[in-house]
């Protein structure tokens, strides 16, 4: 009798999407953006997760200042005329049966003062996103925010580039 009750409870949990085997880290790995140069699609720009709201858990990881970031990171060199492409999953699998949709993506430039300046992202027909780099040479740090399921799931990443002459 107890076995039947246990099997029934586990079955209900699986069917309702409350899988005992749900793995937040595995689910969030699906959100890691692929960031490349339009002129050189094989050149990847590394993004680091800085925080998330996932399945009711909220974590704000350390977001370095631009000065700390530039000191510690090796940046990809980019031409002033290049564009950067961002590719993310439009649907993320949650547990065994549920998928959540990407419904917002925002990009901000992190200024030396620590303030954020919104950057226009353009969505292309093939599902990729693009943005143009600043015309002034220098090192730039960005924060990318992805929102899924009307903001129930959010993940932030930071990355940087160096604009050359």
Positions of the model-derived regions?
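Transition segment at domain starts
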Residues: 25-74
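C-terminal motif of bacterial Sec signal peptides marking the signal peptidase cleavage site
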Residues: 16-17
């Amino acid at each position: 009798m107890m076995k039947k009750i246990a099997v029934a409870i586990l079955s209900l949990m699986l069917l309702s999407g409350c899988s005992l085997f749900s793995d937040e880290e595995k689910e969030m790995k699906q959100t890691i953006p692929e960031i490349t140069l339009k002129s050189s699609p094989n050149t990847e720009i590394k993004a680091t997760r800085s925080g998330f709201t996932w399945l009711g858990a909220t974590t704000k990881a350390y977001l370095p200042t631009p000065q700390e970031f530039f000191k510690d990171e090796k940046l990809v060199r980019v031409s002033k005329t290049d564009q950067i492409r961002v590719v993310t999953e439009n649907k993320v699998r949650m547990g065994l049966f549920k998928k959540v949709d990407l419904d917002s993506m925002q990009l901000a430039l992190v200024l030396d003062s620590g303030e954020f300046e919104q950057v226009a992202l353009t969505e292309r027909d093939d599902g990729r996103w693009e943005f143009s780099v600043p015309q002034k040479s220098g090192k730039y740090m960005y924060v990318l925010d992805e929102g899924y399921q009307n903001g129930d799931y959010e993940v932030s990443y930071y990355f940087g580039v160096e604009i050359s002459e």
